[in-house]
Regions:
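Conserved beta-strand in the GNAT
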Residues: 65, 71-88
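Nucleotidyltransferase catalytic core that binds NTPs
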Residues: 122, 126-135, 140-379
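Short loop/turn microsegments at loop-to-beta-strand junctions
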Residues: 60-62
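Classical Sec-dependent N-terminal signal peptides that target proteins to the secretory pathway
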Residues: 2-24
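A generic structural motif
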Residues: 66-70, 201-204
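Conserved GNAT acetyl-CoA-binding A-motif
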Residues: 110-123
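Conserved acetyl-CoA pyrophosphate-binding loop and the N-cap/start of the following alpha-helix
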Residues: 93, 97-105, 189
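Short amphipathic alpha-helix that is part of the acyltransferase structural core
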Residues: 21-57, 67-68, 72
Length: 379
């Protein structure tokens, strides 16, 4: 199995790295990285992206440009984690194979830093370009966005792996629920939602968002969730993997405003969830109401419409309160930032509180204290 994986990666590398140099137009093209302190080049990138109708994404950790022989920037592309983002070529040079060269460079960069399973979000009108470069469609929002990966059967293999958990299912189970949870950190509000879903259903599939962009690391979030729900015996735990991502890291460069970004994320995320639900026979999903969150409010509204269209019930559960205030992870983070660890004691399960007063918890506390107020609040 390992040799097959190496072979497929090697072939993808050959296809994307060797082919570009067969274009004679490439002789005078240079691909170079651009750093955040290069103000002039970054301003030129913004200009190019604007010309091509693309916003610069807020989440980028690497950017490159294509220079012509006169050192003009005629193309650009970026990465974030295991994704490729913000690809654009000047309209004057489109059709010359520059996209191929930029993508090849980005894939080489990703391989060099150990990322072999790659993803890209692209416009509906240009996804065929990436199909020709070895990327495969996962899901799409018609006339808007296509989500792609460089593994031919990557998502199908993920679904097959998930479906193995059905072997542990009660054969007579009729009510099979799901919750997708970040838990940054795990609170009594999260526990209330899980306990309700567990009580009202035969089986509960609990997906823990595994991308490590939250201030509380994934391994800690997973541990606290599992410890805090150990008394519930009908839960099947899943790492979300690379297919379910948070709104915080969803690419924003396709949409004109924040509302459009949230709607795109919700629609794409729910397309993926529906496929997961079918693989696991899930027929109901539980989510927590979050009246103060613009993101969750829009997401829940779309979900309440889309899931029933696919035969899945959607329950939006009123949030648990303490002294008239909603218990939320952002409120817990706020108290930690203020140094009020004792103040979270009645807002989190015992296992979460014990973590934050432990030596291991001190590192996370220090990171939370360094956050600005915008990063504390969940929008």
């Amino acid at each position: 199995m390992a040799s097959c994986k190496i072979f497929s990666i090697f072939n993808l590398f050959i296809i994307l790295i060797i082919i570009p140099f067969s274009y004679s137009d490439y002789e005078d093209i240079t691909i170079s990285p651009i750093y955040s302190n290069d103000k002039y080049s970054n301003s030129m990138i913004l200009k190019l992206l604007n010309q091509e109708g693309i916003k610069r994404d807020r989440n980028l950790d690497y950017t490159c440009v294509a220079y012509d022989s006169d050192y003009n920037i005629i193309g650009t592309g970026s990465c974030f984690g295991n994704t490729l983002r913000c690809l654009a070529v000047s309209h004057e040079h489109q059709g010359e194979g520059l996209t191929n060269k930029i993508v090849s460079h980005l894939i080489q960069y990703q391989f060099d830093r150990g990322n072999f399973h790659l993803f890209i979000y692209t416009k509906y009108t240009t996804y065929h370009l990436f199909k020709d470069l070895g990327f495969y469609e996962i899901v799409r929002i018609k006339d808007q966005i296509v989500f792609m990966e460089n593994k031919k059967n990557g998502f199908n293999d993920y679904l097959k792996e998930l479906s193995k958990s059905k072997l542990n299912d009660n054969a007579n189970a009729k009510k099979i629920a799901a919750i997708v949870m970040n838990a940054n950190p795990f609170t009594l509000g999260h526990l209330y939602l899980i306990e309700k879903a567990s009580k009202e259903n035969d089986i509960l599939h609990l997906f823990i968002v595994s991308e490590d962009k939250s201030i509380v690391p994934f391994n800690v979030r997973k541990k606290l969730i599992m410890e805090g729900t150990a008394h519930l015996k009908n839960i099947i735990y899943h790492d979300s993997g690379p297919y379910i991502i948070s709104s915080a890291t969803f690419p924003s460069y396709f949409q004109k405003d924040e509302k459009g970004v949230i709607e795109s994320h919700a629609n794409l995320d729910l397309e993926i969830f529906v496929k997961i639900a079918k693989a696991l026979n899930i027929n109901v999903r539980y989510v927590g109401e979050e009246p103060t969150s613009l993101v969750t409010g829009i997401y829940n509204k779309i979900m309440e419409k889309k899931l029933p269209e696919n035969g899945i019930e959607c329950f939006v559960v009123k949030r648990k309160e303490m002294d008239g205030n909603i218990i939320s992870a952002s409120e817990v983070r706020k108290k930690i930032k203020e140094g009020n660890i004792e103040g979270i004691k009645n807002m989190v399960p015992v296992s979460t509180y014990k973590f934050f007063i432990s030596e291991e918890g001190k590192n996370v506390i220090n990171k939370i204290k360094q956050l600005d107020d915008n990063d504390i609040k969940h929008y």
